[in-house]
């Protein structure tokens, strides 16, 4: 075989190309010169010598059964002259342009040699054709190149998707395209002809192409994946691909390899990713004829120039021999196309602009390719689910924001350069990414091409980027859609179907179900935004951007505290004010950082390092968007944060604003402008809030740290009020409100208010509620009976302890209100009873007068009853929605005004000069007085003299401006309000647009006249189909032949065909545009009309407050009318004060038993200042001790609320607080045991109680050993008696505590719950448990036994256990008796001598014997069991 000599010109060109390649690329693969020469020049001459020639032959020859031996014979004949072969190739390259073939280079997973190399070696022809000298020269050159460009190798696998460059670079130069060097790392593509360029343009948004660098070689060839029916040698390659959702597929592809020069591509390549990382496209990106899903992973190298990139686009096709396997792959492709689209965008955002990476493959290990996807080893099962699929949107956006910020900082600092490929594109670049490249890509942008986002997806991405923490509901025609991560939330919470469409997971809801599903998302704790279409089809058609998508904007945002658009009358949610609260915790002043840090550390461990460190000053401001209330307070709290718990229990917030959470939380300092270093929240405060939010599912929102700076927050408030004052949109006088805020609120509260303002500004007009001065109310616990959190829970004021439901609680019994605002106020009355005697008596007088009126059916009471029986909407919420303008509908406005008008008329009727309607109660008379219009806003005067009151005047004004019948039909926010106004003279634009619509309608009539004449059909009329949105249709029978050709057929039936004439369509276009304009103008006029209401908001709000007060008083009157309820008496004198309840009953238990045959056993209890002030209550288990405690406390609460109480007589002092220590619970979250919480609550009681406090302690000390429990209980009660001197009910099972009565006979009394014990023989006492009958009556004296074994028997414990317990109980009693006797024996003689001495002294000098000597005498006398 003669050796082949390379042409000198080609050698020179080869050297220049290699020099360029080495200097331009960053890393170049090592090329084996032997294999390169073998594959490029020493191929046997055959039909496969030239790819173009083979393709031409194959197109003509379709005989599939041609003899393979003939083929080999032909190949051997053409091997005589290789130089002729090279010349032949160059000649054919010039003569014709072959159809470009799509390259595909499968690699063998186990060997570095290609199949064709092995085949050539077997024939014995390849090695003999190589010149040894030439090989040595090539090896030396390649070694030098290898030293300068080290490479990494990875195995190449065939996969579905391929790494692509985002930009389409220019075409290669002609010289470069003619000659390229073959390398086992390269993929070759021919220059694309015009037909394939057109095809690429058509599928630009769906196809992904790999752009690679090609070294020059003598002849440009490509490897083409051919059908199995062709005559070329085929090989099968199996690959594994991974979809974006983590599912894997195993693919097998039959590839046709035409000649050995291209077969070298099968060798293991050195992988190099061009440009920045790009995400793979889904299966739909490839040729529709090739429905299999494999494309080979090609070896890629850096381009020498941008022009080199264009002509090498990897666009491979594949076929499968097995038809069944092919069908299966089609199904797989469809399924993965749906799944892969889900997170294409997000992974692309995450992966793009990152530095290039290369990963080595270890045998059997997963392969990480450039896009970040993992190709699993062969044999991995198909379709493995990825539970984290589709949840990367928020993470991606946060990453984008951080990179954009870094880019801005770099530019600001003068940084430039390429940025390492890590910079994020701006919005302009995103718009460029979705544009199609120019034909052929020769003039394509240098920017990278991204995924094909639809216009709607682009809008979603932009809005989501600005609101990453918001679940977006995007309006799309008659649906609201969710995308991506938001769709997953909707799928989980709403339980609706989700599917993959384009680049996102999608799901949708119909428009009419918006608020139903919105409410579910909000109540689940999500922040939800409504993205609405701000354009209509009619206006879009005439706009300059009619080719663009509909404009959409985020118009409304809701959370659990700001959701007031719900029209569902849910008592559970409507009774809640839905407070949004912000807290601020002040650090101790005059403390250095070390001291503060030490105290914080002690707090973490629950250690009270000092009196000052255990307390904390906390401020808060709470806003109710629903009711308009703004409450504020500052209080000092103890280590238990009991005051904070009490505040949370009272206001029941729906959302809490907290400081930013960082890894150094509670250690980060802020200059708060108050002069101290602030540590945000202490650990104890944070734990308290965290425990509360978890147990109640309250939403928390972290705020910006700068908002906790005093100067910053004050500046925000000043700007807000000054801007509102300058706008002159209302007469609320924002300057006065600002003065009020500065003078009334302290600095900490101003910080909280600034935080709330900043948060409310994110919503629609909610910040305007802060402009009403009358909304601000101080939360003064000292003005009311203090009921801490533990008391509200233990006494079951709001919910019962068994299942946390309202039934069985005090509010369940007493709340008989008829209005929503009244219900909210009544809950506040129960949690904050009065503590001022004058106010209590004033309320009692009003309740008593209403009770008498109910019993006598007096006319005013009958009118009030009829009023509250009628439907009254939530006036408080509706007023707030009217004040916010955009939230109110005409129907809601009409209902609110008509309801207020009806109530005002009733008030005027009751308040006239008719004596039968006069009330004696001062409180009732103040409620029914209306503000006189002549007083002109003087809030201190509410006298009605006979003229028209201001409220009635304003209601008439608002109702006179709207059409009541039309307003009833306008029940949605975006409804057409064009016919709402009575007088159009005030709205000139609306009148002009209506006139234009009338002209169009006249034109329709003229068009119809002309059509009648033209068709000779005088009876022809327009037909309208409102259900389909079709109007002005012309109906003709199908048999009618004279229909003009210009008419457009809309629809038809067997009897009728409907058309639109061109003249009609032209007028319809004008009509639609005019209607949309009218709708916009009507909405603007409606907002302007509601703006007039803001002037009178305070007037209407005060009146609704009167209605709520009347509703609450009427509710108390209904309860007080129950049988057996009496008016309690309050005494001023301290010596006569205390608790004297005769035959009192538990109000809730009695109400529950009233439905059955049972009845509650009344009890009399007396705690007097001059007599027994503390009661020790003992007795058997289940004897009624705890019920007696709750009964007493509930009667006190009901009395101070102003209600009658269940008793035959009741005399009380005015108490300032009720503290309780009942039940047993632990707090795992804060690391507190049951006994620790028990002692914490006891400590809090002892620190805060006064002489006018009622303290209830139930079985204190039971959480520890008997000795410790007795000691703690004894010491606590003794401290209460000696030091605190408060009213106390102390329940215990410890007999030792009964001895306190001996020490303090005038202050302590022993009582027990009565019972009857069945007498038994003395022989059976130790073996049989006696039967006990509970009497549930309070009896004087201490109980001797608790009868715990009787309860064990009732509970169903096994008899063996009970018998053993009885035996052990008897043994313990005997042991205690023996020890007592021994002790008594030792001291008996000494005590006897002392008693004799006392008696002797007493007899000798009775006048000097004091009471203590007598008590000591009695105690010692009893201890030795002597009888006088």
Curated annotation (Swiss-Prot):
User: Which InterPro entries would you find in this protein's record?
Assistant: DNA_mismatch_repair_MutS-lik_N, DNA_mismatch_repair_MutS/MSH, DNA_mismatch_repair_MutS_C, DNA_mismatch_repair_MutS_core, DNA_mismatch_repair_MutS_N, DNA_mismatch_repair_MutS_sf, DNA_mmatch_repair_MutS_con_dom, MutS
- Here the segments flagged for biased composition (Basic and acidic residues) are 9-18, 49-80, 88-98, 128-149, 346-357, 592-601
- Keywords assigned by UniProt? ATP-binding, DNA damage, DNA repair, DNA-binding, Nucleotide-binding
Q: Which GO terms describe its molecular function?
A: ATP binding; ATP-dependent DNA damage sensor activity; DNA insertion or deletion binding; mismatched DNA binding
SMART domains given in the database record: MUTSac, MUTSd
- Start-end of Low complexity biased regions: 217-245
Q: Under the cellular component aspect of Gene Ontology, which terms does the record hold? A: MutSalpha complex; MutSbeta complex; nucleus
The entry's function note states: Component of the post-replicative DNA mismatch repair system (MMR). Heterodimerizes with msh2 to form MutS beta, which binds to DNA mismatches thereby initiating DNA repair. When bound, the MutS beta heterodimer bends the DNA helix and shields approximately 20 base pairs. MutS beta recognizes large insertion-deletion loops (IDL) up to 13 nucleotides long. After mismatch binding, forms a ternary complex with the MutL alpha heterodimer, which is thought to be responsible for directing the downstream MMR events, including strand discrimination, excision, and resynthesis.
Q: Which family does it belong to?
A: Belongs to the DNA mismatch repair MutS family. MSH3 subfamily.
Record note on quaternary structure = Heterodimer consisting of msh2-msh3 (MutS beta). Forms a ternary complex with MutL alpha (mlh1-pms1). Interacts with exo1.
Identification of the protein by name: DNA mismatch repair protein Msh3
């Amino acid at each position: 075989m003669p050796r082949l000599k390379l042409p000198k010109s080609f050698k020179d060109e080869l050297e220049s190309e290699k020099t360029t390649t080495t200097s331009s690329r960053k890393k170049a693969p090592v090329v084996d010169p032997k294999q390169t020469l073998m594959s490029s020049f020493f191929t046997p001459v055959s039909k496969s010598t030239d790819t173009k020639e083979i393709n031409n032959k194959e197109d003509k020859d379709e005989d599939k059964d041609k003899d393979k031996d003939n083929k080999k014979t032909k190949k051997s004949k053409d091997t005589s002259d290789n130089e002729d072969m090279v010349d032949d190739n160059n000649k054919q390259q010039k003569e014709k342009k072959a159809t470009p073939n799509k390259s595909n280079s499968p690699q063998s997973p186990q060997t570095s040699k290609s199949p064709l190399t092995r085949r050539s070696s077997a024939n014995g022809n390849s090695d003999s054709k190589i010149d040894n000298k030439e090989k040595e020269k090539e090896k030396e050159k390649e070694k030098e190149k290898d030293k300068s460009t080290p490479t990494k190798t990875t195995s190449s696998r065939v996969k579905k998707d391929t790494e692509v460059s985002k930009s389409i670079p220019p075409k290669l130069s002609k010289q470069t395209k003619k000659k390229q060097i073959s390398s086992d790392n390269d993929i070759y593509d021919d220059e694309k002809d015009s037909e394939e360029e057109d095809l690429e343009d058509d599928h630009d948004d769906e196809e992904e192409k790999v752009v690679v660098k090609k070294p020059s070689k003598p002849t440009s060839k490509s490897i083409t994946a051919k059908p199995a029916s062709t005559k070329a040698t085929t090989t099968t390659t199996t690959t594994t691909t991974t979809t974006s959702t983590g599912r894997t597929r195993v693919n097998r592809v039959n590839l046709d390899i035409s000649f050995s020069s291209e077969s070298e591509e099968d060798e293991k390549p050195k992988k190099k990713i061009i440009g920045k990382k790009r995400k793979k496209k889904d299966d739909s990106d490839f040729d529709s004829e090739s429905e299999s899903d494999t494309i080979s992973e090609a070896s890629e190298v850096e381009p020498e120039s941008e022009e080199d990139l264009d002509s090498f686009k990897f666009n491979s096709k594949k076929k499968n021999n097995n038809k069944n396997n092919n069908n299966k792959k089609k199904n797989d492709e469809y399924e993965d196309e749906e799944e892969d689209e889900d997170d294409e965008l997000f992974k692309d955002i995450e992966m793009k602009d990152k530095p290039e990476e290369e990963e080595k493959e270890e045998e059997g290990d997963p392969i990480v390719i450039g896009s970040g996807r993992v190709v699993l080893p062969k044999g991995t099962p198909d379709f493995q689910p990825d539970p984290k699929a589709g949840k990367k949107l928020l993470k991606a956006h946060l990453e984008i924001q951080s990179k954009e910020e870094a880019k801005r900082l770099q530019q600001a600092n003068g940084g430039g350069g390429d940025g390492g490929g890590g910079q994020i594109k701006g919005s302009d670049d995103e718009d460029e990414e979705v544009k199609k490249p120019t034909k052929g890509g020769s003039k394509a942008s240098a920017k990278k091409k991204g995924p094909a986002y639809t216009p709607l997806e682009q809008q979603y991405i932009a809005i989501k980027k600005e609101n990453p923490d918001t679940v977006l509901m995007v309006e799309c025609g008659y649906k609201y859609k969710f995308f991506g991560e938001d769709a997953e939330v909707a799928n989980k919470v709403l339980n609706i179907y989700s599917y993959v469409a384009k680049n996102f997971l999608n799901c949708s809801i119909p428009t009419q179900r918006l608020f139903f599903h919105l409410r579910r998302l909000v109540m689940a704790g999500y922040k939800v935004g409504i993205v609405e279409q701000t354009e209509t089809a009619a206006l879009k058609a005439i706009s300059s951007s009619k080719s663009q998508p509909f404009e959409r904007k985020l118009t409304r945002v809701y959370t659990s505290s700001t959701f007031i658009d719900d029209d569902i009358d849910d008592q559970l949610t409507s009774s809640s004010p839905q407070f949004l609260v912000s807290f601020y915790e002040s650090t101790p002043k005059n403390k250095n950082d070390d001291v503060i840090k030490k105290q914080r550390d002690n707090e973490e461990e629950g250690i009270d390092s000092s009196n000052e460190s255990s307390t904390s000053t906390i401020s808060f401001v709470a806003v109710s968007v629903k009711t308009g209330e703004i409450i504020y307070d500052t209080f000092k709290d103890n280590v238990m944060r009991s005051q904070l718990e009490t505040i949370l229990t009272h206001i029941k917030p729906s959302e809490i604003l907290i400081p930013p959470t960082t890894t150094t939380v509670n250690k980060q300092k802020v200059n708060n402008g108050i002069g101290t270093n602030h540590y945000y929240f202490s650990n104890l405060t944070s734990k308290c809030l965290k425990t509360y939010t978890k147990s109640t599912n309250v939403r928390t929102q972290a705020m910006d740290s700068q908002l906790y700076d005093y100067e910053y927050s004050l500046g925000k408030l000043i700007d807000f009020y000054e801007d509102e004052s300058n706008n002159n949109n209302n007469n609320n006088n924002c300057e006065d409100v600002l003065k009020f805020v500065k003078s009334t609120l302290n600095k900490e509260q101003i910080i909280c208010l600034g935080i709330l303002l900043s948060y409310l500004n994110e919503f629609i007009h909610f910040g305007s509620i802060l402009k009403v001065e009358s909304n601000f109310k101080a939360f003064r616990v000292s003005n009311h009976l203090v009921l801490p959190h533990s008391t509200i829970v233990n006494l079951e004021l709001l919910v019962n302890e068994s299942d946390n439901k309202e039934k069985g609680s005090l509010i369940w019994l007493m709340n008989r209100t008829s209005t929503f605002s009244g219900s909210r106020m009544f809950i506040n009355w129960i949690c904050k009873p009065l503590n001022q005697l004058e106010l209590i008596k004033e309320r009692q007088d009003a309740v008593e007068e209403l009770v008498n009126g109910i019993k006598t059916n007096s006319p005013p009471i009958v009118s009030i009853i009829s009023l509250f029986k009628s439907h009254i909407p939530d006036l408080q919420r509706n007023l707030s929605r009217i004040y916010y303008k955009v939230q109110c509908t005409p129907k809601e406005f009409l209902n609110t005004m008509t309801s207020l008008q009806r109530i005002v008329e009733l008030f005027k009727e009751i308040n006239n000069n008719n004596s039968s309607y006069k009330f004696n109660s001062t409180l009732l008379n103040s409620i029914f007085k209306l503000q006189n219009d002549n007083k002109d806003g003087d809030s201190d005067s509410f006298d009605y003299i006979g003229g028209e009151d201001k409220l009635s005047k304003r209601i008439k004004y608002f109702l006179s401006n709207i059409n009541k019948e039309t307003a009833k039909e306008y029940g949605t926010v975006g409804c057409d309000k064009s016919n709402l106004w009575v007088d159009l003279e005030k709205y000139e634009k609306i009148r002009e647009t209506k006139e234009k619509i009338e002209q169009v309608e006249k034109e329709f009539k003229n068009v119809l006249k002309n059509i009648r004449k033209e068709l000779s059909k005088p009876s022809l009329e327009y037909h309208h189909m409102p259900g389909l949105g079709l109007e002005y249709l012309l109906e003709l029978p199908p048999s009618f032949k004279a229909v003009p050709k210009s008419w457009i057929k809309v629809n038809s039936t067997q009897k009728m065909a409907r058309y639109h004439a061109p003249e009609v369509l032209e007028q319809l276009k004008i009509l639609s545009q005019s209607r949309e304009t009218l709708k916009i103008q009507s909405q603007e006029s409606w907002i302007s009309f509601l703006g007039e209401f803001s002037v009178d908001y305070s007037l209407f709000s005060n009146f609704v407050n009167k209605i709520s007060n009347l509703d609450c008083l009427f509710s108390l009157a209904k309860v007080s009318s129950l049988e057996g309820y009496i008016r309690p008496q309050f005494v001023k004198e301290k010596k006569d004060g205390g608790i004297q309840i005769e035959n009192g009953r538990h109000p809730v238990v009695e109400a529950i038993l009233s439905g059955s045959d049972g009845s509650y056993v009344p009890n009399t209890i007396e705690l007097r200042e001059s007599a027994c002030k503390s009661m020790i209550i003992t007795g058997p288990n289940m004897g009624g001790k705890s019920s007696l405690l709750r009964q007493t406390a509930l009667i006190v609460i009901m009395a101070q609320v102003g209600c009658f109480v269940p008793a035959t007589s009741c005399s009380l002092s005015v108490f300032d607080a009720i503290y309780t220590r009942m039940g047993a619970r632990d707090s795992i979250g804060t690391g507190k045991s049951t006994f620790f919480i028990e002692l914490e609550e006891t400590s809090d009681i002892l620190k805060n109680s006064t002489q006018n406090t009622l303290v209830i302690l139930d079985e204190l000390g039971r959480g520890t050993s008997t000795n410790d429990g007795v000691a703690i209980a004894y010491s606590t009660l003794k401290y209460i008696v000696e030091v605190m001197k408060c009213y106390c009910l102390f329940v215990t099972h410890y007999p030792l505590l009964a001895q306190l009565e001996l020490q303090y006979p005038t202050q302590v009394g022993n009582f027990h719950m009565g019972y009857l014990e069945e007498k038994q023989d003395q022989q059976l006492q130790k073996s049989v448990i006696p039967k006990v009958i509970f009497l549930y009556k309070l009896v004087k004296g201490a109980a001797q036994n608790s009868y715990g074994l009787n309860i064990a028997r009732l509970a169903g414990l096994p008899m063996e256990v009970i018998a053993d317990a009885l035996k052990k109980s008897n043994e313990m009693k005997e042991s205690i008796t023996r020890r007592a006797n021994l002790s008594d024996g030792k001291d008996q003689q000494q005590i006897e001598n002392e008693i004799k001495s006392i008696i002797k002294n007493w007899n000798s000098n009775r006048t000097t014997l004091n009471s203590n000597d007598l008590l000591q005498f009695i105690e010692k006398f009893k201890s030795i069991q002597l009888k006088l």
